[in-house]
Amino acid sequence: MKAVVLAVAVLFLTGSQARHFWQQDEPPQSSWDRVKDFATVYVDAVKDTGRDYVSQFETSALGKQLNLNLLENWDTLGSSVGRLQEQLGPVTQEFWDNLEKDTDWLRQEMNKDLEDVKTKVQPYLDQFQSKWQEEVARYRQKVEPLGAELREGARQKLQELQEKLAPVGEDLRDRMRQHVDTLRTKLAPYSDKMRDRLAERLAQLKDSATLAEYHTKATEHLKTFSEKAKPALEDLRQGVMPMLESFRVRLMSMIDEASKKLSAQ
């Protein structure tokens, strides 16, 4: 189970590099940058959405009657959450940095495997692209005379043109399917080979001392994280409790007033 967890982490760490390797797009972000970007977007969305709901409730009849000053409390809560993120951020970043360092050898081996597979597969991809371009050119040659015929003829020939185009399109579709099937057949052994190499790397990882070291470091990290999180969480709790207590007091007051009115009737 530990090997699976670490393997998933390694694949996550190497994921952007592999994508950049195949697509040759912009340089990949680090894993920690991706985590921070995702977390920032998610937390900001939650805070903005939550503040909208709080604002809507506070402007409602019930909200005005309760007079809870929810927006002010919400902003205070947001500040507490921000401080919590600032305090815990360095601890989490240190964990990711250590994980990347500890698994660097495995990522390098995986990148070598990808490079090897890409080198062997590239000729088949080039051949497929060439076949595709040939089929498109062949299709264009067949269609161009029909287009000229349509321009020269009247509208009544449109149906005839469609009938002539149908078999040409079907022929192109069938030929392209054959090329795709051929490519899939040629690439299958390399897919199996890559899967076997991954299994071999994971087996090496399982038998190495890195896994035990990682488990120890992860345990130490969680302990440190817990110790540093306690004061931040207490600060967060102190920010939330006044809001909850104010809500409870005002709600109980409303219930008492409603009970008195019912008793007086």
Curated annotation (Swiss-Prot):
Chief place where the protein resides: secreted
Intervals holding Sequence repeats: 68-89, 90-111, 112-122, 123-144, 145-166, 167-188, 189-208, 209-230, 231-241, 242-265
Span list, region 10 X approximate tandem repeats: 68-265
PTM (free text): Glycosylated.
Gene Ontology CC terms, in alphabetical order: chylomicron; endocytic vesicle; extracellular vesicle; low-density lipoprotein particle; spherical high-density lipoprotein particle; very-low-density lipoprotein particle
Subcellular location: Secreted
Keywords annotated in UniProt: Cholesterol metabolism, Glycoprotein, HDL, Lipid metabolism, Lipid transport, Lipoprotein, Oxidation, Palmitate, Phosphoprotein, Repeat, Secreted, Signal, Steroid metabolism, Sterol metabolism, Transport
Family classification: Belongs to the apolipoprotein A1/A4/E family.
PANTHER family: APOLIPOPROTEIN, APOLIPOPROTEIN A-I
Quaternary organization: Homodimer. Interacts with APOA1BP and CLU. Component of a sperm activating protein complex (SPAP), consisting of APOA1, an immunoglobulin heavy chain, an immunoglobulin light chain and albumin. Interacts with NDRG1. Interacts with SCGB3A2. Interacts with NAXE and YJEFN3.
Protein name: Apolipoprotein A-I
